[in-house]
């Protein structure tokens, strides 16, 4: 009699999980220990395991709690979220998956790998799965492994599908794993990481110190806005100087309504250029240019070498 009751109980339990796995709100549990509460409306998984949702998300964690009525999944401890369909992986300690809203809230610190190329380290991020957008209002570090570029951003929104990055208070280090690199500071910007184009406001670009053959220099650009696409970078209302930053008033500078670096034509052009010495205007040029970085000798007033950078333009 006891064996018969045990067999009936096992059959009922198996049927429950089979029906649940193939329901409209399918979640398949594969955990070491499971608890079913509130008439089957709450499921708790313990002692490590994996769940797979019907929309292709695989989550591994130490503990799970699923509220079937609210369609909310909680996970804690050594979490890995793998969305194979959309090509991203997230590691964290605490997540809340609001399935009806298609929203995954990652609480605390986390790391994310997108397209096996973009490595995000952030805190309190949100994944909007229906829009494929990653958001965070906390400082975030992004490493673009392909282009060897480091981004540090105070606030961001990243389109996983389009590889479009929007951010505020942005620091960029190009070729970050090399001894010398260029540094960029943008108040806010939008980047297309696919083709390395961007538009930005309130820019401050610090070129590597030895770019003109003198490590004591601090060559830099400032401008109210900048954009870059298809090998052409522009800076609006820009200022250029290579004087040391410790000089409160730079001994010299070039100001222009527009500065254009055209990689295709191998030229750097200035519109309405004003040369200043100790902040005193001394010479004005409606048009002013010098050869680009790939040109060693050419007629012109200046022959600089601009660092090899996908942000400003590759030399």
PLM region descriptions:
Residues 2-24:
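Classical Sec-dependent N-terminal signal peptides that target proteins to the secretory pathway
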Residues 21-315:
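Structural signature for solvent-exposed beta-strand/loop edge elements and short helix-capping sites
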């Amino acid at each position: 009699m006891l064996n018969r009751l045990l067999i009936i109980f096992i059959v009922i339990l198996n049927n429950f999980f089979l029906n649940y796995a193939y329901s409209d709100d399918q979640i398949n549990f594969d955990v070491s220990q499971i608890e079913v509460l509130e008439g089957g409306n709450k499921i708790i998984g313990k002692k490590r395991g994996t769940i797979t949702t019907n929309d292709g998300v695989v989550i591994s964690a130490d503990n799970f709690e699923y509220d079937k009525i609210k369609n909310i999944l909680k996970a804690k401890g050594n979490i890995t979220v793998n969305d194979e369909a959309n090509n991203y992986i997230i590691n964290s300690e605490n997540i809340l998956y609001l399935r009806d809203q298609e929203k995954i809230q990652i609480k605390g610190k986390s790391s994310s790998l997108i397209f096996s190329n973009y490595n995000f380290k952030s805190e309190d991020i949100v994944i909007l799965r229906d829009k494929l957008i990653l958001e965070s209002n906390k400082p975030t570090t992004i490493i673009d492994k392909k282009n060897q570029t480091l981004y540090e951003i105070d606030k961001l929104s990243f389109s996983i599908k389009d590889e479009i990055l929007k951010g505020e208070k942005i620091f960029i280090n190009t070729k970050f794993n090399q001894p010398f690199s260029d540094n960029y500071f943008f108040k806010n910007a939008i980047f297309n990481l696919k083709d390395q184009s961007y538009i930005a406001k309130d820019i401050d670009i610090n070129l590597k110190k030895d770019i003109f053959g003198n490590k004591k220099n601090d060559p830099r650009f400032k401008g109210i806005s900048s954009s870059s696409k298809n090998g052409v970078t522009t800076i609006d209302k820009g200022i250029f100087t290579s004087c040391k930053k410790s000089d409160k008033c730079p001994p010299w500078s070039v100001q222009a309504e527009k500065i254009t670096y055209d990689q295709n034509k191998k030229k750097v052009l200035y519109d309405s250029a004003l040369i200043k010495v100790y902040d005193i205007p001394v010479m004005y040029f409606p048009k002013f240019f010098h050869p680009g970085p790939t040109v060693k000798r050419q007629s012109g007033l200046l022959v600089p070498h601009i660092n090899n950078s996908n942000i400003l333009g590759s030399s």
